[in-house]
């Protein structure tokens, strides 16, 4: 079991990530006031002293602790560390992402130093607004005793008000953060309005990171010429395994408890190319060859990626996790060289052997460019410049087996020749994810649109596509798009891309599910509704002999052999009518044609 300490934005993200595993875990908060939906998580409420934590971990067979608590919950962090050492439990620290420390801000180590600085006779404060939370009220009372006007900004909940009163605050000294439901104004605008009303000469903040609104508060204060003093975040205990995002969290859990997630995540080709490029830069520019490099993902978090080195640069062996990806195990290489001309773009990215070339429009790079998508290009450039801001380099990405593997991908159909694409949006592959499959469908639909054809022909796979291509012999190959099981989503994409004509080619197994209103026909989502099939047969109408035979079928395709040939066209019309009922509303401004295909490739239409 996993024990999570949360109550924060990071705690909420931890829950979302762990819930995907479908396995139970414990989620502990001090106050129990966080509004969070738990399906497999088991909520715990209240402080957990060291001895209680030890007893709980032992009695519930805890094998991993995730510390996603507030960075300033120092007592809890050190309690977790002591329990971890005593029970030999690994701890993952879900840390926040912190911006670089702004030199325009006055940085202090703790409240004691803050009080000394605020009462310094050379630069004394007169009016101080603390945004450090309700727990800061008692700590800052010495300022009030010295005649300094204090205000405290706290959360708008009853427990915070009660605690504020207990610590000596009065109503005139309290102001509140916007309610979570207040979406009319940005946080910065609310900060500005508050600062202008109170006119403090100092705003006291904690280094709470991006999710704590640190930059918004400090930017607003500095823009008004207000002095900002920030308390540095406490140093975490040694031994914690630190992540700063949901992807890194999942991969760390997969590493420590491999059985928790039934399926493991992987890395996109874009992330692998980025890691290889960054490693090659370390070798060229610093004469260093680290075994892992820190890769910043598009969401801002950083994950470690293992790298290898060779004569021309560095490489990464692609790990696709449990995703059925033909690129799994490929070596993705990067070599770097100096541009020799500071007038060039800082980082020039090229495709080498095994990286495809774009030959058709519809991509985020022009025809003739290497098939390295926009997000991977940005990742490569941003990661290199994060470490080497003055670098002027040419980066060449190569995939030695890319040309061979490309034959087993969508690339030939998309007009990408000579190799595979370097792709990725999040940088991480979620195994068998619907999002990943829909993204590939969307790319195919965009290429189909860029072809200039008015019609897109969507089909379930290679078999049905072969038959519908025979039905539309004059159409180019790129307008034939596989939907897998996501019929509804694919039609919606066609509508969003303003296709005037859409043809849906469907075989009977999926058609009977679709006719019953199931727009996702995956066997995990739905099975054939035999009673509905029998109702459609009666609608034909078929006689009782056919009905009795149909009652015994296992697969829908058996119906082709049961229904008399003279009634097949009418049966097809009934099935298509019901499919059309559910699909047509998804294409309100286009014309939908549905083709029902039998096992021999005969095509029926209404």
What is the role of each PLM region?
Residues 165-173, 177-224, 229-233:
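A C-terminal functional module that forms or caps the active site or interfaces directly
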Residues 26-48, 103-105, 161-167, 303-306:
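N-terminal beta-loop-helix "entrance" segment that forms/cooperates
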Residues 260-408, 412:
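Generic N-terminal targeting/processing segments that precede catalytic cores or assembly contacts
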Residues 264-267, 414-420, 425-572, 581-582, ...:
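A structural signal for small-residue-enriched, beta-sheet-centric alpha/beta enzyme cores
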Residues 41-57, 176-190:
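Glycine-rich, highly charged phosphate/nucleotide-binding loops
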Residues 64-114:
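Glycine/small-residue-rich loop that forms an oxyanion/phosphate-binding "nest" at active or ligand-binding sites
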Residues 133-177, 188:
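Anionic-ligand binding region
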Residues 27-36, 94-98, 134-136, 154-160, ...:
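Short, polar loop motifs at secondary-structure junctions
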């Amino acid at each position: 079991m996993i024990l999570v300490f949360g109550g924060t934005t990071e705690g909420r993200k931890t829950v979302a990530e762990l819930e995907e595993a479908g396995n139970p875990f414990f989620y502990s908060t001090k106050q129990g006031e966080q509004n969070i939906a738990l399906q497999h998580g088991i909520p715990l409420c209240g402080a957990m002293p060291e001895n209680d934590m030890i007893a709980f971990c032992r009695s519930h067979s805890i094998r991993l602790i995730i510390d996603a608590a507030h960075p300033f919950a120092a007592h809890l962090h050190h309690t977790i560390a002591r329990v971890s050492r005593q029970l030999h439990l690994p701890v993952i620290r879900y840390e926040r992402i912190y911006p670089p420390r702004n030199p325009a801000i006055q940085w202090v180590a703790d409240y004691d130093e803050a009080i000394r600085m605020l009462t310094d006779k050379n630069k004394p404060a007169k009016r101080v607004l603390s945004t450090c939370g309700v727990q800061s009220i008692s700590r800052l009372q010495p300022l009030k005793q010295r005649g300094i006007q204090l205000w405290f900004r706290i959360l708008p909940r009853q427990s915070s008000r009660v605690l504020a009163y207990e610590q000596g605050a009065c109503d005139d000294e309290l102001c509140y953060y916007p309610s979570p439901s207040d979406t009319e104004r940005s946080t910065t605008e609310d900060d500005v309005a508050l600062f202008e009303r109170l006119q403090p000469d100092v705003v006291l903040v904690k280094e709470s990171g991006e999710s704590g609104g640190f930059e918004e508060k400090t930017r607003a204060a500095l823009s008004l010429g207000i002095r900002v003093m920030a308390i540095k975040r406490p140093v975490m205990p040694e031994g914690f395994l630190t992540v700063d995002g949901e992807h890194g969290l999942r991969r760390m859990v997969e590493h420590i408890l491999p059985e928790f997630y039934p399926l493991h995540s992987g890395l996109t080709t874009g992330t692998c190319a980025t890691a290889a490029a960054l490693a090659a830069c370390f070798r060229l520019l610093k004469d260093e060859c680290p075994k892992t490099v820190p890769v910043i993902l598009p969401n801002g978090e950083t994950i470690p990626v293992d790298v290898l080195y060779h004569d021309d640069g560095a490489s990464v062996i692609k790990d696709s996790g449990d995703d059925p990806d033909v690129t799994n195990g490929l070596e993705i290489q990067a070599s770097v060289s100096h541009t020799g001309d500071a007038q060039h773009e800082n980082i020039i990215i090229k495709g080498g052997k095994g990286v495809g070339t774009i030959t058709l429009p519809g991509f985020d790079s022009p025809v003739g460019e290497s098939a390295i998508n926009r997000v991977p290009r940005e990742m490569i450039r941003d990661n290199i410049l994060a470490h080497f801001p003055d670098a002027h380099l040419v980066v060449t990405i190569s995939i030695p087996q890319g040309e061979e593997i490309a034959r087993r991908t969508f690339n030939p159909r998309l007009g990408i020749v000579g190799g595979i694409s370097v792709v990725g949006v999040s940088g991480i592959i979620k195994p068998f994810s619907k999002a990943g499959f829909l993204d590939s469908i969307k790319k195919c639909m965009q290429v189909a649109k860029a072809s200039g054809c008015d019609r897109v022909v969507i089909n379930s796979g290679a078999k049905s596509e072969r038959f519908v291509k025979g039905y539309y012999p004059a159409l180019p190959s790129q307008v034939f798009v596989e939907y897998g099981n996501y019929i509804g989503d694919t039609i919606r994409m066609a509508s969003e891309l303003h296709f005037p004509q859409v043809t849906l080619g469907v075989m009977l197994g999926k058609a009977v599910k679709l006719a019953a209103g199931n727009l996702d026909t995956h066997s995990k989502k739905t099975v054939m509704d035999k009673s509905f099939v029998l109702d459609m047969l009666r609608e034909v109408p078929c006689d009782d002999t056919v009905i009795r035979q149909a009652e015994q079928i296992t697969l829908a395709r058996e119906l082709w052999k049961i229904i008399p040939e003279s009634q097949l066209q009418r049966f097809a019309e009934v099935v298509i009518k019901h499919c059309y009922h559910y699909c047509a509303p998804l294409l309100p401004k286009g014309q939908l044609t549905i083709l029902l295909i039998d096992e021999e490739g005969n095509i029926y239409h209404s």
